[in-house]
């Protein structure tokens, strides 16, 4: 199967800023919201291209959007695909401004 090349910024949408992702950054793992149709190889190549680091592992997870109540009835939050990226030892990505 041939991977379709997409621009890196179309694959990596934004970093996840939370207490859990901040704690994982101490272990060299960084969490990003990615395009729903992106695969692990594309995510790895995009991170290496954008941040100039060596990626050793990529874990992905799909988060279903929650049902929310609105004034007029019920709605849904957007589904998200997240990637937890592990970088090589001694390298880091500065997404928290440290």
From Swiss-Prot:
GO biological process: translation
A GO-annotated cellular component: ribosome
InterPro entries with a match to the protein in the record: Nucleotide-bd_a/b_plait_sf (IPR012677), Ribosomal_uL23-like (IPR013025), Ribosomal_uL23/eL15/eS24_sf (IPR012678)
SUPFAM superfamilies referenced in this protein's UniProt entry, alphabetically: Ribosomal proteins S24e, L23 and L15e (SSF54189)
UniProt entry tagged with the keyword Ribonucleoprotein: yes
Span of the signal peptide: none
Any single Pfam family the record assigns to this protein: Ribosomal_L23
Keyword Ribosomal protein assigned: yes
Keywords from the named record: Ribonucleoprotein, Ribosomal protein, RNA-binding, rRNA-binding
Molecular function per GO: rRNA binding; structural constituent of ribosome
HAMAP family, A to Z: Ribosomal_uL23_B (MF_01369_B)
Functional summary from the UniProt entry: One of the early assembly proteins it binds 23S rRNA. One of the proteins that surrounds the polypeptide exit tunnel on the outside of the ribosome. Forms the main docking site for trigger factor binding to the ribosome.
Assembly description: Part of the 50S ribosomal subunit. Contacts protein L29, and trigger factor when it is bound to the ribosome.
Family statement: Belongs to the universal ribosomal protein uL23 family.
Protein name, per record: Large ribosomal subunit protein uL23
Species this chain originates from: Bifidobacterium animalis subsp. lactis (strain AD011)
